[in-house]
């Protein structure tokens, strides 16, 4: 394993310190290979590997693999592999494997589980911040974590995954890079970096950006202006010494956890997490349940006074009450939402959020200079009530000619505030039919 990490790092132009390499070991030690394995359902299992990628205790990523087995500890060979990068708030398991352990959906009802059941070799990463433990007070170790840091980590993890696939007899087949939300931004940054390498050394055979924009097109000048406002606000916070947090403020995951926990345990109690009349004059304190449903169905309210990335942006589609506030979720089970909130990672590094806003603002960033040289097939998946069609322009920055757009919508664009949401892509009851099955068909065809 140490040799695999060293080789993968070298491919990215990174030399890891000896102590980092020696710590790039599998979690657990219950078997000779040293990996941690959890049987999920049928012949599908989940493996975790913990990789030290820097000098401090926090410079760690977790590599995940969800795969069919021929037997315990024997991953089946597969000609198709997908490597997943999560976005803000939730790590790999919460984002892509949320069905496992859920009280509301069967274990196979998540994207990673579904693809693995269908024979795809699924890999993914927990970025460094996803593993920072609750209670951390000093975030100076995040000072130099940037999009470049995360893109490099993805490259190392991709390299390890490829070497392990080769060791398992997967000599042929493609590896597709899937990035959701800010994970798509990291994906663009990684592909820009990989374009420096000779074609024979490139690791990604296809790109699946899900519901995110890195640049806005000419007709979306308002969204670019909003990004500039967010960039200025977050830059001010960084100049004042903040190193952790994001659009929801410091420790964003702690708020998300509290919202989910209280909605599940005390749904009818007035929420003490927000001020009275937070949703308008005379509305009083929302119940814990109402706060969770509004946070999911009208997510832009959490960003105030900042504007959201696009108009009507939300995590989950909903139907409104008499005041126009979300009252019932349309596509995702309410209890599943409450579980989801409780699985958020407590903290996040701030730099990549600032850099993303700079990119969307149209400022010069070091992450798109070579995107025109990226010519792998692309599948853009947009949620009509998330980023949706606003993310399609970003794909045109690539040099790819084989481009497919999967637009997940149930309503006209004018009703985007109620339509399929950013996280419905993974949590909705019908996501398997609307999203995952066409995604699988694209993977099999490429």
Q: How does the language model describe each region?
A:
Residues 386-393:
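Conserved alpha/beta-hydrolase "acid-adjacent" motif
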Residues 142-166:
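Alpha/beta-hydrolase active-site loop
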Residues 167-181:
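Alpha/beta-hydrolase fold nucleophile elbow
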Residues 70-124:
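Short, surface-exposed "cap/lid" segments of acyl-processing enzymes
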Residues 21-77:
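N-terminal cap/lid segment of alpha/beta-hydrolase-fold proteins
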Residues 184-218:
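Conserved hydrolase catalytic core segment
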Residues 367, 404-446:
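Catalytic active-site module of serine/aspartate enzymes centered on a nucleophile-bearing elbow/loop
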Residues 222-377, 381-386:
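Alpha/beta-hydrolase
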């Amino acid at each position: 394993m140490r040799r695999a990490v060293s080789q993968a790092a070298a491919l990215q132009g990174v030399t890891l310190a000896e102590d980092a390499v020696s710590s790039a070991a599998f979690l657990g030690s219950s078997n000779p290979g040293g990996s941690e394995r959890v049987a999920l359902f049928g012949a599908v299992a989940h493996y975790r590997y913990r990789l030290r990628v820097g000098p401090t205790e926090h410079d760690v990523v977790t590599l995940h693999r969800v795969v069919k087995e021929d037997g315990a500890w024997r991953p089946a060979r597969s000609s198709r592999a997908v490597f997943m990068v999560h976005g803000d708030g939730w790590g790999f398991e919460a984002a892509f494997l949320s069905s496992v352990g859920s009280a509301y959906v069967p274990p196979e009802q998540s994207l990673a589980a579904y693809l693995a059941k269908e024979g795809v070799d699924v890999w993914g990463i927990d970025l460094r911040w996803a593993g920072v433990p609750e209670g951390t007070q000093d975030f100076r170790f995040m000072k130099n974590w940037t999009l470049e840091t995360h893109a490099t980590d993805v490259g190392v993890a991709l390299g390890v995954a490829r070497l392990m696939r080769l060791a398992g007899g997967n000599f042929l087949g493609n590896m597709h890079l899937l990035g959701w939300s800010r994970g798509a931004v990291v994906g663009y940054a990684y592909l820009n970096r990989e374009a420096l390498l000779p074609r024979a050394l490139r690791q990604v055979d296809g790109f699946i950006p899900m519901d995110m924009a890195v640049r806005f097109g000419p007709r979306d000048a308002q969204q670019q202006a909003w990004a500039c406002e967010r960039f200025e606000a977050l830059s001010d916070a960084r100049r004042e010494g903040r190193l952790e947090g994001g659009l929801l403020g410091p420790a964003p995951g702690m708020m998300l956890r509290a919202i989910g926990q209280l909605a599940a345990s005390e749904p009818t109690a007035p929420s003490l997490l927000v001020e009275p009349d937070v949703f308008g004059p005379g509305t009083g304190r929302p119940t814990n349940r109402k706060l969770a449903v509004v946070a999911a169905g009208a997510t832009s309210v959490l960003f105030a006074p900042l504007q959201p990335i696009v108009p009507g942006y939300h995590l989950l589609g909903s139907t409104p009450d008499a005041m126009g506030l979300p009252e019932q979720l349309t596509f995702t089970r309410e209890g599943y939402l409450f579980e989801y909130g409780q699985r958020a990672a407590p903290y996040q590094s701030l730099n990549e959020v600032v850099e993303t806003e700079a990119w969307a603002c149209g400022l010069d960033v070091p992450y798109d200079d070579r995107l025109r040289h990226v010519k792998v097939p692309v599948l853009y998946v947009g949620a009509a009530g998330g980023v949706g069609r606003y993310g399609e322009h970003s794909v045109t920055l690539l040099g790819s000619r084989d481009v497919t757009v999967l637009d997940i919508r149930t309503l006209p664009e004018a009703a985007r505030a109620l339509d399929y949401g950013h996280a419905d892509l993974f949590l909705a009851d019908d996501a398997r039919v609307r999203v995952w099955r066409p995604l699988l068909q694209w993977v099999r065809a490429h």
